[in-house]
Amino acid sequence: MKRPGSNKRPAKSKDGAESRPKRANRGRQQLRTITRTARRDVDAPVEETPESSESEAEEAAPEEKKFEQGKAYDALLTLLQSEHPEKSDKKKTASRHEEDDVAGVNLEEDDDDDDEEEEEEENDEVEDDANEHGDPFEVHFGVDDEAVAAKAALLSARWPVAHKAKVGAYAVTTHASPGEKTAACEAPRAQTLGAPVKKRVADAFAARHPAPFSPLEQELAHHIFSYRDVLYASRTYDNTVHRKLYAAHVLNHVFKTRDRVLKNNDVLKNYHSAQQQGKATGPEPEPRDQGFTRPKVLILLPTRNAAYEVVEQLIGMSGAAQQENRRRFKAQFHADGGPPDSKPADFRAMFHGNSNDFFSIGLKFTRKSVKLYASFYGADILVASPIGLAMILEDPKQAKREYDFLSSIEVLVVDRANELEMQNWDHVHTVLRYINKIPKDFHGADFSRIRMWAINDHARLLRQTLVFCDFLTPSVSNVITHSQNIAGKTRFRPETTAQTCVMNSVGLRLKQIFQRFDAPDPQSSVDARFRFFVNSVLPSLSKQTSYDDGLLIYVPSYFDYVRLKAHMKTHTKLDFSAIDEYSSRAKITRARHFFSTGKTKLLLYTERLHHYRRFELAGVKNIVLYGPPENPLFYKELLRFVGKSVFKGDADTDLSFIKTIYCKWDAAALERICGAEKAAVLCNSVNEMFEFR
């Protein structure tokens, strides 16, 4: 699946100066294609988008005109169109090339000037504000090499539960790595950041966030600063407590790494000086304090605006007086405006500012400055979108592929994971596949300083993975399930009750039907759902509905949508339209108009299209959900479609319904819709059909 765009690129001119050479299968358009990962019985037919007349293109409703406000947001809408005429204007072509570039990419080796600058700063006094033996950083990364090797042999075993707790509305579960317990040091639970966090970070954090931590923030900070893997679902888009915590954590990690290297440099320098004077005693120190390459932190984010906010937070907490390339960074990553106020609040927050998803930038910190657009091999922190990194990691030209800069990542942050799912989760898998691989080249690394567990290809066992999302999904949860951090992993699972679920907040007494089908495992549920729908649900729809028109079929998965549409075209005589994220604006406008006026009786509608456009569909009288939406807000918005028809007098609450097809493997999504108590009944009861109002 991809957000469609033109496959054409300007041809290279004779002198090669005016445009780029054409690259086969490269660019945002190719990389946004979601490859099929599971077998399908029905192949997806290739559809040709019908050409639309000018009058059809001008049929857009007033809502569409408001929708186009804001330059950055309009750029997002442009990506969703399938018809992109090629521009002949050279200036515009050059501009488009700049936009197609992965903003911030710099794969050159680190500059000599930067090395000289750091050598000057090495003379500065290194902060010594933490007890090494009581510091989670020192204990975690200073673990014995033999202990790491022993853990590596046991990672396929079961990870036992080490601790369970209930903090507010969250169930917190910590799993320990299998085998003998290694040396560990946990960060304290406190109302603010303190030791062992570096003083400069703690002071800057306190200045920006003076309020004491809530119990949830204390628990979250405890696990993050103890170097455990963390999976945290924030429940709502505006709950951003985790962002300030991981920003402080990655800065603390970078500064401690730098200070450790500088301290050991002094130790070696003093030894060699004593050796020259004939005063050296004992063997030469052999500190192991480095990886193959410099980058230690990778932060994955969905949009440039999200990256802008995180980088600004990092700069603010770093206390850097000098900020190199700050103006260029703001020009490429920041933008004003966004979606209109008529859109939901979470949607406006998601696509506010620059919503371009194509970027990758390096940040290099010294004691007095921060350099934006640093070389990837000289940066401390990499901030990127998965699609931006995939462009580099899997360049079609084998010789241009680069992944060495990910070899020594020690902290991985995946933020706004649900948005990344909607873009293309395959790119997250691509990044995870390349991270902590032994590099092809060694880029001037000092092997005498590289940690043995890195040389032994065990870096993944020490890497901390932090995943943050609005709601838990199987894809997001699997990142932590398959992580191998020997410090353990902690999950923060929000508990949804009947009082806090979406169903309880609708305010519309509408018939809500849930119908279960059987599936022995998640893999077989795809085919089982399709068979159940086409054999049991689809044939009975005309008998169950009280209206001849206004039936909306909502399909969460694009592959299921293509399969279902192909079946309905070839095996039924249903009068229906189908719109998805590939459809042109004219086609969407036409389909919506025909559906709202009753000329089309049935409309197929994908979850990803709703995510990116959040339409207010008119004429909806009944809804069938091919599967429960992962985002519970979508369920509420779908109900509102029917409520709109009821308000206009086109439908009646006693006759209209919303039916959800589900199996026991949809339990997490059901819990967010109807609460944990009802979800347990829906999945485990003998009955297969339930009705609520």
UniProtKB/Swiss-Prot annotation:
Which residue ranges have biased composition labelled Acidic residues? Answer: 44-61, 107-130
- The keyword Nucleus belongs to this UniProt entry's keyword annotation: yes
Q: Does the keyword Chloroplast apply?
A: no
Q: Which UniProt keywords apply?
A: Nucleus, Ribonucleoprotein, Ribosome biogenesis, rRNA processing
The processes (GO biological process) annotated in the record are: maturation of SSU-rRNA from tricistronic rRNA transcript (SSU-rRNA, 5.8S rRNA, LSU-rRNA)
The UniProt regions of compositional bias labelled Basic residues, in chain numbering, are 1-11
GO MF term (any one): rRNA binding
Which protein, by its recorded name, is this?
U3 small nucleolar RNA-associated protein 25
Q: Which organism is it from?
A: Clavispora lusitaniae (strain ATCC 42720) (Yeast)
